[in-house]
Amino acid sequence: MVKSCRRSFLKATGAAVAYAATPVTAAEESFALSYMLASSMYGKTNLEEILPEVKRTGSDSIDIWPMGHANQREQIETMGHDRFRDLLERHEVRLGMTTRYDLGPYRLQDEMNFVKAFGGHQIVCGAKNANGDTLKEKVSNFVKSLSEAIKLAEDLGVTIGIENHSGSLISSADSIKYFCDLSPSKHLGIALAPYHLPQDANLLAELIEHSNDKLAHFYAWQHGMGCHKPMPKPLELLQLPGHGVLDFGPAVTALAKIKYDRHVEIFMHPTPRGIPIVDGTAAVGDVINQAKEYMSRAIARTGV
């Protein structure tokens, strides 16, 4: 297994080097991605230290995570909302969204108001199971159960993004398609995580196109060797674009085709949770920027 992983890692590294040899010009990048920075990539690092990294990573906003994977959401409550607002203004950073798996889809009312108050536009959480004889019926009943949350989201101008998390109702390709078809509002969409899907570049592109305007968020995140057991750092980083073997070219082509104008997050999970993906705040930003460079090369070579 280790030898196979090492071959995959070397293969991916070689491919990344090959892409690096291809020059990328502004003219070639007719389609561009807008990036958001996930605070969880820095573990429990202080927000004061993370916020300058938003601009350095070419992002325009931040995704705030709570305890479990990070603790920046709790940091905000400790420092106070006025202090958080001051920090955002000082570093010229916007709150993009919060990720609240801890709340689930039925307890988002207060968080939606928080996000709105800071100019954010989205909350991501997971799905809940629902009754039904078929997968489509279960998805339909889940969507119907969100009617009050959708109404508040519409009133506030906030989107609820449901991630296709493995083991949840919205996890398979079919469930994602049903969910996007049945969502009655642009304020309820899919937060698409390739990590939790078969590592098939064409399937990923198909799901992006099918989701279309219901694609609320895209994680540039592949499965690699997974994220549930300790492993050497190079193997853990196989979750990142340009490190693992998943080709994101078809994905960016599909994103361009649907004129995707929401955010992309360079993403992964470390083991254990709650630590930075690599040691050192600047080093985390460097790793994210390397993955972004891969995404830019993917755009350039697809000609979108």
Indicate where each model-derived feature is located.
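Hydrophobic faces of well-ordered beta-strands that scaffold small-molecule active sites
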Residues: 33-39, 62-64, 95-99, 123-125, ...
